[in-house]
A protein has these predicted regions:
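Bacterial N-terminal signal peptides
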Residues: 28, 38-49
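Short glycine-rich loop/turn motifs that provide flexible caps or phosphate-binding loops at active sites
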Residues: 42-45, 63, 71, 75, ...
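Serine-esterase "nucleophile elbow" of acetyl-processing enzymes
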Residues: 54-102, 112-120
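N-terminal secretory signal peptides that target proteins for export/translocation
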Residues: 1-33
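Acidic-and-aromatic substrate-binding clefts and catalytic sites of carbohydrate-active enzymes
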Residues: 103-107
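Alpha-helical cap/lid subdomain in secreted, periplasmic
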Residues: 5, 82-85, 92, 108-238
């Protein structure tokens, strides 16, 4: 917290004390006493203003699946943990709640979100939908669930960052392309920023995946963080 002292209070007090020098001591004592109280109140008001201007908080909720839950990784090496480090290095007052669960679907996220919003986050990062597609669920259901989550977060006065995904082409070109495009459509319709593809710069590099060829290794998570950071940074309060 930075305290700014313009010197106005002390200068004003000295001026009044000099002006009161010719007044009786009893009257002068009352005036100076009142002035000192007023100066103290002005100082407290300045402290409150300064604290508000220089120490804004960013409370971030991450609602995702295994890609955000450090699946197969050492604790603290996933992109969400790296985000906390990035925020600290940027001197941004922040806190992160990682509510990501491996295997989570958009339906599960929608069910859990109301309770999570009771924490009154400033920003909600939604990284869901991939497990819906891997299970071959109807795209309309995924879109409906994501839209409901965005709406709920916005109604709670939170800013939203939507994180898009792609799925392997073996699910059929039509399905995979429609799945990918639904994120951009939703972001445009709901007026929220979009990270087009969380695994951009990773998906075409087999060496950056674990043995299951689905989950990235630790070395890929700084890239994932950079992908998210480009959309998140404009939402942060400095």
């Amino acid at each position: 917290m930075q305290i700014i002292d313009s010197g106005l209070g002390n200068g004003f007090q000295n001026l009044i004390e000099r002006s009161c020098s010719k007044i009786g001591s009893k009257t002068r004592s009352k005036i100076v006493g009142s002035l000192r109280l007023a100066t103290l109140l002005l100082g407290l008001l300045g402290l409150v203003w300064t604290n508000s201007a220089y120490s804004a908080s960013n409370s971030i909720l991450v609602l995702g699946d295994s890609l955000s839950a450090e699946y197969g990784l050492a604790r603290g090496s996933g992109w969400v943990a790296l985000l906390q480090q990035r925020l600290k290095s940027e001197n941004l007052d922040s806190s992160i709640t990682n509510a990501s669960i491996s295997g989570e679907t958009s339906s599960g996220g929608k069910t859990r979100l109301p309770a999570l919003l009771q924490q009154r986050p400033d920003i909600v990062i939604i990284e869901l939908g991939a497990n819906d597609a891997l299970r071959g669920l109807q795209l309309s259901a995924t879109e409906t669930n994501l839209r409901a989550m965005i709406s709920a977060a916005q109604q709670a006065k939170a800013k939203v960052l939507l994180v898009g995904m792609r799925i392997p082409p073996n699910y059929g070109r039509d399905y995979t392309e429609k799945f990918f495009s639904l994120y951009a459509t939703l972001a445009k319709q709901t007026k929220v920023p979009l990270v087009p593809f969380l695994l951009d710069g990773i998906a075409d590099k087999p060496e950056l995946f674990q043995a299951d060829r689905i989950h990235p290794v630790a070395q890929a998570h700084p890239i994932m963080l950079n992908n998210v950071w480009s959309g998140l940074k404009p939402l942060l309060v400095k």
